[in-house]
């Protein structure tokens, strides 16, 4: 995925 959840994982 490349959504908000993916961004938060960084």
Curated annotation (Swiss-Prot):
Signal peptide: none annotated. Its EC number is 3.1.-.-. Optimum temperature below 60 degrees Celsius. Active from 0 to 100 degrees Celsius. The keyword Plastid does not apply. Optimum pH is from 5.5 to 6.0. One of its GO terms (molecular function) is hydrolase activity. Inhibited by sodium ion, potassium ion, magnesium ion, calcium ion, Cu(2+) ion, zinc ion and Fe(3+) ion. Keywords: Antibiotic, Antimicrobial, Fungicide, Hydrolase. GO terms for biological process: defense response to bacterium; defense response to fungus; killing of cells of another organism. Has ribonuclease activity towards yeast tRNA and polyuracil and weak ribonuclease activity towards other polyhomoribonucleotides. Has weak deoxyribonuclease activity. Displays antimitogenic activity towards murine splenocytes and antiproliferative activity towards HepG2 hepatoma cells and L1210 leukemia cells. Has antibacterial activity against Gram-negative bacteria P.aeruginosa and P.fluorescens, and the Gram-positive bacterium S.aureus. Monomer. This is Antimicrobial ribonuclease. It comes from Pleurotus sajor-caju (Oyster mushroom).
């Amino acid at each position: 995925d490349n959504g908000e959840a993916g961004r938060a994982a960084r």
